[in-house]
Amino acid sequence: MKSLLLLVLISICGADHRSDNYTLDHDRVIHIQAENGPRLLVEAEQAKVFSHRGGNVTLPCKFLRDPTAFGSGTHKIRIKWTKLTSDYLKEVDVFVSMGYHKKTYGGYQGRVFLKGGSDNDASLVITDLTLDDYGRYKCEVIEGLEDDTAVVALDLQGVVFPYFPRLGRYNLNFHEAQQACLDQDAVIASFDQLYDAWRGGLDWCNAGWLSDGSVQYPITKPREPCGGQNTVPGVRNYGFWDKEKSRYDVFCFTSNFNGRFYYLIHPTKLTYDEAVQACLKDGAQIAKVGQIFAAWKLLGYDRCDAGWLADGSVRYPISRPRRRCSPTEAAVRFVGFPDKKHKLYGVYCFRAYN
């Protein structure tokens, strides 16, 4: 009797299983439960996509629907894209589409549209990418009372660099840190960006703000007092601090630029004011810290001449370590914030392309 009952149950389950198959592609079958299961499924074919500042990217998103649940299409399909904040507490509207009605929000206006590769394609194309476009995006599809979501991460090729102003180390609250990065053609880095930089070899013994409001620093060679001598390498976390009162350095992130970074050939050394004017006379502007890091990391720029930058610092980029030119490692070498009246250095300029 027990064997007969088991056989009956297996037969019923098998029948239900076969009746709820909907073939959507040549090689894909999705199983939708007729009673309580999802009648709408949203998925991203890639969890992460990569691009760079100034480039274009497609955030993949497709939806699969049960044709028996929605009939002949009496419900309009609504597609909404939002950007998630780093703490996942808020969503920033990016794009909404319902039939012929479409709306774009904020800085995305004129830069985003649906790919529309097929009837079930909700992929979003973003053009002329900016540093602020980095992050996680949510694709939401709504039809009638059914809805589902998928999340796609947009990663940008770039470089993370530590920064502190002329005042010295540990002088920036969170909001000042954000502005300091913006002033240097960069944005405040995320934890993921700092973590990737650490995996790439970044070692820095001063704690800095990150975009989520945490304070951390990357150590590849633990030592006293940098992470502790007998500890493992890693990204050290100071935790979350008061954004108004607490003061640290900052980790900035920048990406490819649309222009030319170069060391200006000049017959004499320059004061800071002379350096600014020399770049202007050459049809350019004095370069920013983010631009020297991007040229060094992304273009392999190498120059063993110390030069003024826009923030009043003096630095030089070395991609090929050699005697008297950063012999131990490839790096952007920091000379300091000298007296701006000293006539001791050259200048790095940046000419933007139209």
Curated annotation (Swiss-Prot):
Recorded GO MF terms: hyaluronic acid binding
InterPro entries to which the protein is assigned, alphabetical: C-type_lectin-like/link_sf, CTDL_fold, Hyaluronan_bind_Proteoglycan, Ig-like_dom, Ig-like_dom_sf, Ig-like_fold, Ig_sub, Ig_V-set
Record localization: Secreted, Extracellular space, Extracellular matrix
Annotated SUPFAM superfamilies: C-type lectin-like, Immunoglobulin
SS bond list: C61-C139, C181-C252, C205-C226, C279-C349, C304-C325
Residues with glycosylation annotation: N21, N56
Gene Ontology cellular-component terms listed: extracellular space; perineuronal net; synapse
Pro-peptide positions on chain: 1-15
Domain Link: 159-254, 259-351
Protein family (similarity comment): Belongs to the HAPLN family.
Protein name per the record: Hyaluronan and proteoglycan link protein 1
Native source species: Equus caballus
